[in-house]
Every structure is written in C-alpha cells, then in structure tokens.
Amino acid sequence: MRIERVDDTTVKLFITYGDIESRGFKREDLWTNRQRGEEFFWSMMEEINEEEDFVVEGPLWIQVHAFEKGVEVVISKSKNEEMMNMADDNMNNEFDRQLNELLEQSFEDENEESVQGNQQQRRSHASDHSKRARHTNGRLVIVKFEDLESVIDYAHHSNQPTDDFEDLLYMLNNEYYYAIHFDDNVGEEVINDFYSQLLEFTQPSDRSEMYLNDYAKIIMSHNVTAQVRRFFTDTEEI
C-alpha cells in the first residue's frame, strides 16, 4: 500500500488488488460485504496512523476511485467547526453513516452512478425498464447466476455482442440476477440464440423483474460484462 500525505488534513493511498488479497480480503468484499469492507477500511486507517500520524479526530470525507490494478482512496478530516464540535457519539454515528454509504456504492466513479445516493433515480430507472418490458413482449430476459464466480466466468468467456441491449446486474440473498432488455430492432431468432448461450453459464430466473426491482439491489448497469472484466480477473487464470 502506498500512502501519500497531501496536507495536514488529507491523505491519499493506493492499494493494489493483490495487496488487498494478501491482507485476507477479497476485492469483492469492498462492495458486496459491508462488514468486511468496514474491517478492511479500519485496518487501513490503523496503518495510515502509524506511518503518517493521521489520527481520526472527527468526521472524515472519503473518496474512492477504482482502477484496473487497484483502488485509490482519498481521506480528509472535516474542517467544519460545527462538525468538529460534535459530541463523540454523534460524531462516530456520522462517520459510520458516511462509511456505510461509501461501502454501498458500486465503485461510484467507474459506474458514474451511486446506487446508495440515487435510490429514487434507481427506482425510476427500474420502472422505465419495467414499462418497456411490458410493451416489448419477449424482449426481456432474466437469468440467475449461482455466485459471483459464475458472473466472472460468463463475463470472460462469453463472446456475445453488447450493442443491442441494456442490462442490469442485481444481487439478492448472495445470488446474482442478470436482466437484459433487447432493442426493438433485434429479431426473435437472435434473442433465442443469445438466451441459449447464456444458459450455458446460468439458469432461468425464478424472480420477475418487478420482484427484483422491489427487493434486490442493482450493483451494475450498462454493459455489465465489460465492467466485470475490468474489476475481476478470470477465475481460471488464478
């Protein structure tokens, strides 16, 4: 892990995915497992404090940027006097709230959309998809991946085109659901062929899109396979 002291109130660090795994964490822990994500963050803060004497004395502002090789994190102490004078319990609660919001984002700068911070937008977006699916009968496909490894396997070994549809990846009860909305100009034969190839990596979904919109969490959207390939290496190469 590389740590850079920006000024008295800000530090910046870069940690590779290999370093993350060497510390006993999986890279997906950072955005699918809140408890493990918090453990990882606090272990980093202890190391930063030891190397840079950067003591947490109030609310922190955190920015995360995901790259191909690892993650860059910028941590700043609040300069707001009102926040700095906050009671300890309230201060800790405020920090926990910020950290939880951070950990619920799906690499916000890479996806250009925060799942946590745009809950209303997400519901509107999902509603639009539902309406479209009702009006384009047969153009919606939903399948289920058993686990994240199956998602990664599909992303790295599928050669299906991605120009003729919009897609969403949901997570529900540690299972992953993949919804695909095909464009109007895509023929039924093409859709059926796509679905047949998809079933080599998945199984038919037992959940409707309406159910997923209400109870599941959207963790990726817009060319899901490309995002998965960017963040995760092929499991067969490990």
From Swiss-Prot:
Domain of life, per the record? Bacteria
Q: Sorted alphabetically, which Pfam families does this protein's record hold?
A: MecA
Question: Which molecular function term from Gene Ontology is one that the record holds?
Answer: protein-macromolecule adaptor activity
| Residues covered by region (Disordered) | 108-133
Looking at the UniProt entry, the stretches that span the membrane are none
Q: List the disulfide bonds.
A: none
Task: Provide the function of this protein.
Answer: Enables the recognition and targeting of unfolded and aggregated proteins to the ClpC protease or to other proteins involved in proteolysis.
Domain free text: The N-terminal domain probably binds unfolded/aggregated proteins; the C-terminal domain interacts with ClpC.
Q: Which family does it belong to?
A: Belongs to the MecA family.
Subunit note = Homodimer.
Name this protein carries in UniProt = Adapter protein MecA
Taxonomic source organism: Staphylococcus carnosus (strain TM300)
